[in-house]
């Protein structure tokens, strides 16, 4: 009976706090486990200890029995618990019958247990010896191995990582992943490669429901309840499946408003009788009316109206009143005048006094005084008593009064913008090479200013026209003058035919246009050109009198034939400019004094001329052919018009906002136009973007005479009266959404100034990144 009660108490009250779970290897050690179980059941055979199955173990014992092996100890615990359960089932009836009779015995057993517990605390007790013997028989675990190395199941949930709520990637560089309750490192489980991952995907049917625990690095299999919970959260439903979303509403409080009086006291008797105080007040008011002391409302209003008098309303009364209130509550003080500077002193420093050039510029702006930097001219006196009266004093005081009286005042928030922020970020010129940087050659031979220059399509020869009435043909590589053609008048413009199959130079001198065969280069090409210009083709079209009076075609005379002149086109006014079409069959001339016949188009193959315009819309300064489309650019003094030669209509009108246009150059692709003006500006037009300039460049100090695009490289150049040739980078992208990139690269200033003239014309080499410039110093310079 005592044995059964002890087992019962052991199963209910004194369960061990540290449970050991059996591993899968218990079946391999059955013999050792049976011996160990036999030793526990028959303690008399293995030890002299008075402990047995009746002995009760408590967790607070200083020398508590501990199992060193998970397998054997857990097996022993399972055997004992199963035997205890069998004893309990077999002796339930006996325990119920003898429960009352054994109360005394239980007390005695407890006393014995306490005595045996005291004896167990002693090191010389037999219980300690039996524990040591039992511990020695159990195999010890290797502490160097990770606790979950032998099993990849999730049964070792008692292992806890104590690192806390920290990012686990902090342990990526270490072999362990944290620390357990004994402050021992938790070694990371072995990680497979991609092949292992692929095999697990194929072989493991539960791979899709396996997740990795970031605290321990183990693979955790999700249960059906976990998956159902995840599905409910993903679908946006309540995680708890037992929750009823549409359960019936219970009205804990009524929704009907019940109106009930706070108090239901019956009215007093005096509420039905007239008020005595009101009766006295009315009697006093009646007496005041009889005596004339009190006036009616109409009489009071009439007296107020008489005091106010007639009232007149302003048409904008609301606005004036609002402005009046604003001035009262938020007044804006008048701006103070600028304090006088050193330039206004009666004895200013010498650097503040005007020199001859500054005085001339100041006097030149007499009609536009607002453009002057100073409204007066600084003067110097020896003493203060020599300073005369200020002649502009009354006028300046009067203008100051007008500003204070008439100019509206308003507060403006000043924007503090860094100047560097407004400057666009441009690439370095070193990254945009090649471009001309130095002067390589000077062509000398003319005796007067050189007005025009043109290059052969192959880039071997150069032609120039000068005011000394000569046309010179140069060899570019050596700088040698090959041929000189003398004319009767000043040569205004020369242009080499862009067709490489012909060798023709158009020379504009006076009112004659000469078509010259330079007799340089390929002899076959020279002969072919002579054959083309030898005889005039038959005319199938009858020319009008308007064209006949404007232009006449004729063959050159014998003396001119020896010089190379083949055809002479005589105009009725002096020619200023000549330009070729890209194919080399058409050329156009400009006569600024020709009114509505200022621009003429000539066809070389048929020796026929046309007047494209019947009315004059300004003085034509420059004309140009489109390189791709049948369009004709006509520049007047202020605007540029683009005409379609096929449809014979105006396509677009470009607004330059300049005083006088000097020249034009079109990009080889035909979508961008560069314009030079006499008011120191260069205008870049994007023909697909707008009719206004895309960018205005003020790179020169004087009038810009000429501009030119390179045929192959993204370069353009400009020449000005400040003796400078400025080379710039002009990249045009195929992407229409990307704006052109314009970067000034190099300023080449080697020409000399003559009679306020500098560089008159610029032109590019057709193949190399070289630029030619002509100047008033009668030289032609090559920059490479």
Curated annotation (Swiss-Prot):
PROSITE patterns: WD_REPEATS_1, WD_REPEATS_2, WD_REPEATS_REGION
Region named Disordered: 1-159
Ion transport listed as a keyword: no
Entries under SMART domains matching the protein: BOP1NT, WD40
Compositionally biased region (Basic residues): 1-11
Keywords from the UniProt entry: Nucleus, Repeat, Ribosome biogenesis, rRNA processing, WD repeat
InterPro entries: BOP1/Erb1, BOP1_N_dom, WD40/YVTN_repeat-like_dom_sf, WD40_repeat_CS, WD40_repeat_dom_sf, WD40_rpt
Keyword Nucleus: yes
HAMAP family, per the entry: BOP1
Entry protein name: Ribosome biogenesis protein BOP1 homolog
Organism (species): Drosophila melanogaster
